[in-house]
Amino acid sequence: MTATASDDEAVTALALSAAKGNGRALEAFIKATQQDVWRFVAYLSDVGSADDLTQETFLRAIGAIPRFSARSSARTWLLAIARHVVADHIRHVRSRPRTTRGARPEHLIDGDRHARGFEDLVEVTTMIADLTTDQREALLLTQLLGLSYADAAAVCGCPVGTIRSRVARARDALLADAEPDDLTG
């Protein structure tokens, strides 16, 4: 699901209401953002950890929501928290032996798909996984989650121009990895 400006405004309004102690607004805020957070952390880390990382993201967000002041959209604020959760997780995982290898693409699709569609998904997922972390993060934030370049820059803590160049490099890398036959259909 790609976020629209009206979606972001509604989610931000829910977060502001939750910051004032409205439990129903907090519940609605979590429901409205849970899928985006899960997909973001699944791509940045691995599917096996996505549920735990999503939960940790929301635990941190709930603790910090009384201080949320809407300087950015609530979605941007939440994805920045998710990014920090993933970074903490990666630091922890690097300190011990790794037992799993990346995301399993079959967990990233909904329902039954045709075999070719599944093969395409596996190929694209593998190509995205081969991007640098910075490129993958910028591409996912702007192209999958639909954040503006400015919001993606806020999540990543870097200038907008850096996000633009990371997305451009990611697209170039994906096109270079694609086989010529795939480009012509």
UniProtKB/Swiss-Prot annotation:
Residues 123-174 are annotated as: Sigma-70 factor domain-4. Induction: The most abundant of the sigma factor transcripts, it is expressed in exponential phase; repressed by detergent (7-fold), heat shock (9-fold, 45 degrees Celsius) and in stationary phase. Not autoregulated. Residues 30-94 are annotated as: Sigma-70 factor domain-2. Residues 149-168 bind DNA. InterPro entries: RNA_pol_sigma-70-like, RNA_pol_sigma-70_dom, RNA_pol_sigma70_ECF_CS, RNA_pol_sigma70_r2, RNA_pol_sigma70_r4_t2, RNA_pol_sigma_r2, RNA_pol_sigma_r3/r4-like, WH-like_DNA-bd_sf. One of its GO terms (molecular function) is DNA binding. The keyword Transmembrane does not apply. Disruption phenotype: No effect on growth in culture, or in isolated macrophages; infected guinea pigs have a highly attenuated infection with few granulomas and no necrotic centers. One of its GO terms (biological process) is response to xenobiotic stimulus. PROSITE patterns: SIGMA70_ECF (PS01063). Changing W77A: Red shift in fluorescence emission. The keyword Transcription regulation applies. Keywords: DNA-binding, Sigma factor, Transcription, Transcription regulation. A motif (Polymerase core binding) lies at residues 52-55. It comes from the Bacteria. NCBIfam families: PRK09649.1, sigma70-ECF. Was identified as a high-confidence drug target. Sigma factors are initiation factors that promote the attachment of RNA polymerase to specific initiation sites and are then released. Extracytoplasmic function (ECF) sigma factors are usually held in an inactive form by an anti-sigma factor until released by regulated intramembrane proteolysis; this sigma factor does not seem to have a cognate anti-sigma factor however. It has been suggested that the sigma domains 2 and 4 may interact via polar residues in this protein to autoregulate. Positively regulates expression of a small regulon of genes. The sigma-70 factor domain-2 mediates sequence-specific interaction with the -10 element in promoter DNA, and plays an important role in melting the double-stranded DNA and the formation of the transcription bubble. The sigma-70 factor domain-2 mediates interaction with the RNA polymerase subunits RpoB and RpoC. The sigma-70 factor domain-4 contains a helix-turn-helix (H-T-H) motif that mediates interaction with the -35 element in promoter DNA. The domain also mediates interaction with the RNA polymerase subunit RpoA. Belongs to the sigma-70 factor family. ECF subfamily. Interacts transiently with the RNA polymerase catalytic core formed by RpoA, RpoB, RpoC and RpoZ (2 alpha, 1 beta, 1 beta' and 1 omega subunit) to form the RNA polymerase holoenzyme that can initiate transcription. This is ECF RNA polymerase sigma factor SigC.
